[in-house]
Protein backbone atom coordinates (compact mmCIF):
# COMPACT_ATOMS: atom_id res chain seq x y z
CA UNK A 1 0.00 0.00 0.00
CA UNK A 2 1.17 3.50 -0.73
CA UNK A 3 0.74 6.60 1.38
CA UNK A 4 1.28 10.27 0.62
CA UNK A 5 4.03 11.78 2.74
CA UNK A 6 4.25 15.30 1.32
CA UNK A 7 2.89 17.90 -1.08
CA UNK A 8 5.34 20.25 -2.80
CA UNK A 9 5.11 23.37 -4.91
CA UNK A 10 8.05 22.86 -7.30
CA UNK A 11 10.02 19.96 -8.79
CA UNK A 12 13.12 21.24 -6.96
CA UNK A 13 11.41 20.87 -3.60
CA UNK A 14 10.18 17.44 -4.65
CA UNK A 15 13.69 16.34 -5.63
CA UNK A 16 15.03 17.48 -2.27
CA UNK A 17 12.33 15.50 -0.46
CA UNK A 18 12.95 12.37 -2.53
CA UNK A 19 16.69 12.56 -1.93
CA UNK A 20 15.97 12.81 1.76
CA UNK A 21 13.83 9.68 1.57
CA UNK A 22 16.59 7.86 -0.27
CA UNK A 23 19.07 8.74 2.46
CA UNK A 24 16.70 7.24 5.02
CA UNK A 25 16.76 3.86 3.34
CA UNK A 26 13.92 4.00 0.84
CA UNK A 27 14.55 2.59 -2.60
CA UNK A 28 13.59 4.65 -5.64
CA UNK A 29 11.09 1.91 -6.54
CA UNK A 30 9.37 2.56 -3.20
CA UNK A 31 8.80 6.23 -4.04
CA UNK A 32 6.24 7.62 -6.48
CA UNK A 33 5.16 11.08 -7.55
CA UNK A 34 1.65 12.09 -8.61
CA UNK A 35 1.13 15.39 -10.41
CA UNK A 36 -0.76 17.07 -13.21
CA UNK A 37 2.38 18.86 -14.40
CA UNK A 38 4.11 17.88 -17.64
CA UNK A 39 7.59 19.23 -16.88
CA UNK A 40 8.71 16.19 -14.90
CA UNK A 41 11.44 14.74 -17.13
CA UNK A 42 14.21 16.27 -15.05
CA UNK A 43 12.60 15.02 -11.85
CA UNK A 44 12.43 11.46 -13.17
CA UNK A 45 15.99 11.47 -14.49
CA UNK A 46 17.39 13.03 -11.32
CA UNK A 47 15.70 10.74 -8.81
CA UNK A 48 14.83 7.60 -10.79
CA UNK A 49 11.34 7.60 -9.30
CA UNK A 50 8.14 7.01 -11.19
CA UNK A 51 6.04 10.08 -11.98
CA UNK A 52 2.33 9.37 -12.46
CA UNK A 53 0.32 11.92 -14.40
CA UNK A 54 -2.93 12.68 -12.60
CA UNK A 55 -6.01 13.18 -14.70
CA UNK A 56 -8.07 16.34 -14.60
CA UNK A 57 -10.62 15.81 -11.91
CA UNK A 58 -13.06 18.13 -13.64
CA UNK A 59 -13.24 16.16 -16.90
CA UNK A 60 -16.50 14.26 -16.79
CA UNK A 61 -15.45 11.78 -19.47
CA UNK A 62 -12.28 10.83 -17.58
CA UNK A 63 -11.91 8.56 -14.63
CA UNK A 64 -12.67 10.53 -11.46
CA UNK A 65 -9.87 11.67 -9.22
CA UNK A 66 -11.37 9.68 -6.40
CA UNK A 67 -11.25 6.48 -8.43
CA UNK A 68 -7.79 7.34 -9.73
CA UNK A 69 -6.40 7.65 -6.23
CA UNK A 70 -8.26 4.55 -5.21
CA UNK A 71 -6.68 2.54 -8.03
CA UNK A 72 -3.23 4.05 -7.58
CA UNK A 73 -2.94 3.63 -3.84
CA UNK A 74 -4.40 0.13 -3.73
CA UNK A 75 -2.62 -1.58 -6.61
CA UNK A 76 -0.11 -4.26 -5.70
CA UNK A 77 2.93 -5.40 -7.63
CA UNK A 78 0.76 -7.25 -10.17
CA UNK A 79 -1.31 -4.11 -10.77
CA UNK A 80 -4.46 -5.84 -9.56
CA UNK A 81 -7.08 -3.96 -7.59
CA UNK A 82 -7.10 -6.02 -4.43
CA UNK A 83 -7.95 -3.38 -1.83
CA UNK A 84 -11.19 -1.62 -1.08
CA UNK A 85 -11.42 2.12 -0.48
CA UNK A 86 -11.84 1.61 3.23
CA UNK A 87 -8.43 -0.03 3.36
CA UNK A 88 -6.57 2.93 1.87
CA UNK A 89 -3.82 4.44 3.95
CA UNK A 90 -5.43 7.84 3.39
CA UNK A 91 -8.32 9.63 5.03
CA UNK A 92 -11.41 9.97 2.91
CA UNK A 93 -11.90 13.61 3.89
CA UNK A 94 -8.44 14.40 2.46
CA UNK A 95 -9.38 13.41 -1.08
CA UNK A 96 -10.73 16.86 -1.93
CA UNK A 97 -7.58 18.46 -0.57
CA UNK A 98 -5.37 16.27 -2.76
CA UNK A 99 -7.59 17.07 -5.71
CA UNK A 100 -7.12 20.80 -5.15
CA UNK A 101 -3.36 20.33 -4.83
CA UNK A 102 -3.17 18.52 -8.15
CA UNK A 103 -5.39 21.08 -9.83
CA UNK A 104 -2.96 23.75 -8.59
CA UNK A 105 -0.02 21.96 -10.20
CA UNK A 106 1.51 20.66 -6.99
CA UNK A 107 3.41 17.39 -6.68
CA UNK A 108 2.38 14.60 -4.32
CA UNK A 109 5.12 12.28 -3.05
CA UNK A 110 4.06 8.80 -1.98
CA UNK A 111 5.99 5.88 -0.51
CA UNK A 112 5.33 2.19 -0.21
CA UNK A 113 4.28 1.66 3.39
CA UNK A 114 5.51 -1.95 3.18
CA UNK A 115 9.05 -0.86 2.34
CA UNK A 116 11.75 -2.04 4.72
CA UNK A 117 13.02 1.21 6.25
CA UNK A 118 13.90 2.35 9.75
CA UNK A 119 11.05 4.80 10.27
CA UNK A 120 8.39 6.56 8.16
CA UNK A 121 9.18 10.06 7.02
CA UNK A 122 7.22 13.30 7.01
CA UNK A 123 8.66 16.56 5.74
CA UNK A 124 6.33 18.60 7.91
CA UNK A 125 3.80 19.22 5.11
CA UNK A 126 2.28 15.75 4.99
CA UNK A 127 -1.46 15.43 4.89
CA UNK A 128 -1.72 11.74 5.69
CA UNK A 129 -1.94 10.71 9.30
CA UNK A 130 0.11 7.53 8.78
CA UNK A 131 3.50 9.17 9.33
CA UNK A 132 5.05 11.11 12.15
CA UNK A 133 5.96 14.77 11.84
CA UNK A 134 9.61 14.31 12.77
CA UNK A 135 11.83 16.35 10.51
CA UNK A 136 14.97 14.24 10.52
CA UNK A 137 15.83 14.38 6.81
CA UNK A 138 19.07 15.92 5.66
CA UNK A 139 17.72 17.23 2.37
CA UNK A 140 20.24 18.09 -0.32
CA UNK A 141 19.19 21.19 -2.24
CA UNK A 142 20.79 24.23 -3.76
CA UNK A 143 17.84 26.44 -2.91
CA UNK A 144 18.02 28.87 -0.02
CA UNK A 145 15.39 28.59 2.66
CA UNK A 146 14.23 31.58 4.62
CA UNK A 147 12.73 31.74 8.08
CA UNK A 148 11.18 35.04 9.16
CA UNK A 149 12.09 36.35 12.59
CA UNK A 150 9.28 38.16 14.34
CA UNK A 151 9.03 40.27 17.39
CA UNK A 152 6.24 42.00 19.20
CA UNK A 153 6.24 45.78 19.07
CA UNK A 154 4.26 48.04 21.31
CA UNK A 155 1.52 50.04 19.67
CA UNK A 156 0.05 52.73 21.87
CA UNK A 157 -3.23 54.38 20.98
CA UNK A 158 -4.76 57.34 22.73
CA UNK A 159 -8.37 58.14 23.39
CA UNK A 160 -10.07 60.94 25.24
CA UNK A 161 -11.78 59.86 28.45
CA UNK A 162 -13.52 62.03 31.02
CA UNK A 163 -11.68 61.91 34.31
CA UNK A 164 -13.60 64.63 36.13
CA UNK A 165 -15.56 67.85 35.83
CA UNK A 166 -15.77 71.24 37.50
CA UNK A 167 -19.08 72.75 38.56
CA UNK A 168 -19.19 76.40 39.63
CA UNK A 169 -22.04 77.64 41.80
CA UNK A 170 -22.75 80.37 44.39
CA UNK A 171 -23.74 80.31 48.00
CA UNK A 172 -24.70 83.21 50.26
CA UNK A 173 -22.74 83.80 53.41
CA UNK A 174 -23.56 86.34 56.15
CA UNK A 175 -20.88 88.43 57.73
CA UNK A 176 -20.86 91.40 60.08
CA UNK A 177 -19.66 94.75 58.85
CA UNK A 178 -18.67 97.61 61.23
CA UNK A 179 -18.68 101.22 60.07
CA UNK A 180 -18.19 104.53 61.88
CA UNK A 181 -20.54 107.20 60.52
CA UNK A 182 -20.45 110.83 61.82
CA UNK A 183 -23.88 112.10 62.86
CA UNK A 184 -24.99 115.51 64.18
CA UNK A 185 -27.36 116.39 66.97
CA UNK A 186 -28.41 119.50 68.88
CA UNK A 187 -27.22 120.14 72.39
CA UNK A 188 -28.90 122.64 74.74
CA UNK A 189 -27.03 125.31 76.50
CA UNK A 190 -28.54 127.98 78.83
CA UNK A 191 -26.81 131.24 79.57
CA UNK A 192 -27.83 134.30 81.46
CA UNK A 193 -26.58 137.53 80.01
CA UNK A 194 -26.95 141.12 81.13
CA UNK A 195 -28.99 143.44 78.86
CA UNK A 196 -28.95 147.19 78.27
CA UNK A 197 -30.86 148.94 81.05
CA UNK A 198 -31.94 151.73 78.77
CA UNK A 199 -34.33 149.53 76.86
CA UNK A 200 -37.90 150.46 77.69
CA UNK A 201 -39.84 147.86 75.72
CA UNK A 202 -39.98 145.29 78.45
CA UNK A 203 -43.23 143.45 78.94
CA UNK A 204 -45.15 143.36 82.19
CA UNK A 205 -43.81 141.02 84.77
CA UNK A 206 -45.67 137.74 85.09
CA UNK A 207 -44.86 134.07 85.44
CA UNK A 208 -46.64 132.76 82.37
CA UNK A 209 -44.03 133.34 79.68
CA UNK A 210 -42.30 130.29 78.18
CA UNK A 211 -39.98 129.64 75.23
CA UNK A 212 -39.60 126.34 73.33
CA UNK A 213 -36.46 125.27 71.45
CA UNK A 214 -36.64 122.10 69.25
CA UNK A 215 -33.73 119.72 69.60
CA UNK A 216 -32.71 117.94 66.39
CA UNK A 217 -30.28 115.10 65.80
CA UNK A 218 -29.35 112.90 62.84
CA UNK A 219 -30.36 109.29 63.01
CA UNK A 220 -28.84 106.52 60.81
CA UNK A 221 -31.05 104.74 58.35
CA UNK A 222 -29.34 101.58 57.03
CA UNK A 223 -30.31 100.15 53.66
CA UNK A 224 -28.57 97.48 51.56
CA UNK A 225 -28.24 97.16 47.79
CA UNK A 226 -26.39 94.55 45.72
CA UNK A 227 -23.37 95.64 43.74
CA UNK A 228 -20.98 93.63 41.53
CA UNK A 229 -17.56 93.46 43.10
CA UNK A 230 -15.91 90.51 41.29
CA UNK A 231 -16.55 87.91 38.62
CA UNK A 232 -15.45 84.29 38.19
CA UNK A 233 -14.19 83.07 34.81
CA UNK A 234 -13.99 79.29 34.19
CA UNK A 235 -12.09 77.89 31.21
CA UNK A 236 -9.77 75.03 30.34
CA UNK A 237 -6.53 74.59 28.43
CA UNK A 238 -4.70 71.53 27.12
CA UNK A 239 -1.32 70.67 28.56
CA UNK A 240 0.95 67.81 27.51
CA UNK A 241 3.01 65.60 29.78
CA UNK A 242 4.90 62.33 29.42
CA UNK A 243 3.35 59.19 30.86
CA UNK A 244 5.60 56.14 31.33
CA UNK A 245 4.37 52.70 30.32
CA UNK A 246 6.11 49.34 30.69
CA UNK A 247 5.12 46.10 28.96
CA UNK A 248 6.77 42.76 28.20
CA UNK A 249 7.12 41.77 24.53
CA UNK A 250 8.33 38.58 22.89
CA UNK A 251 11.01 38.40 20.22
CA UNK A 252 12.11 35.50 18.06
CA UNK A 253 15.83 34.76 17.94
CA UNK A 254 17.36 32.25 15.51
CA UNK A 255 18.88 29.14 17.04
CA UNK A 256 21.26 26.86 15.18
CA UNK A 257 21.53 23.23 16.20
CA UNK A 258 24.33 21.23 14.58
CA UNK A 259 24.36 17.46 14.58
CA UNK A 260 27.33 15.53 13.37
CA UNK A 261 29.98 17.05 11.14
CA UNK A 262 28.87 20.33 9.56
CA UNK A 263 31.42 22.21 7.46
CA UNK A 264 31.38 25.89 6.57
CA UNK A 265 29.76 27.26 9.72
CA UNK A 266 31.39 29.56 12.21
CA UNK A 267 30.99 29.09 15.92
CA UNK A 268 28.04 31.48 15.91
CA UNK A 269 27.03 32.50 12.37
CA UNK A 270 23.74 33.90 13.63
CA UNK A 271 25.49 36.29 16.02
CA UNK A 272 23.28 35.32 18.92
CA UNK A 273 23.81 37.48 21.97
UniProtKB/Swiss-Prot annotation:
Disordered: annotated span: 241-273
UniProt-listed PANTHER family: STRESS RESPONSE PROTEIN YSNF
Q: Which organism is it from?
A: Bacillus subtilis (strain 168)
* UniProt induction comment: By phosphate starvation, via the alternative sigma factor sigma-B.
Q: Which NCBIfam families match?
A: YsnF/AvaK domain (TIGR02271)
- Top-level taxon in the UniProt lineage: Bacteria
- Keyword annotations for this protein? Stress response
- Name recorded for this polypeptide: Stress response protein YsnF
Q: What is the lineage of its organism?
A: Bacteria, Bacillati, Bacillota, Bacilli, Bacillales
The biased composition feature labelled Basic and acidic residues covers 241-264
Gene symbol of the encoding locus: ysnF
Amino acid sequence: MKSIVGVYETPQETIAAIEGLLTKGYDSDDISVVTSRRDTDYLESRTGTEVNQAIDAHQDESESFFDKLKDYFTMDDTATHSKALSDLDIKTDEIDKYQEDLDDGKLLVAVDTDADVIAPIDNGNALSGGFSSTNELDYTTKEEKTMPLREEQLKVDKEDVQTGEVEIGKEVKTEKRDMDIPVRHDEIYVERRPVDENKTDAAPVNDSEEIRVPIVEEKLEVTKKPVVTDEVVVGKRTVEENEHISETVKKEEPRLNKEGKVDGLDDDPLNNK
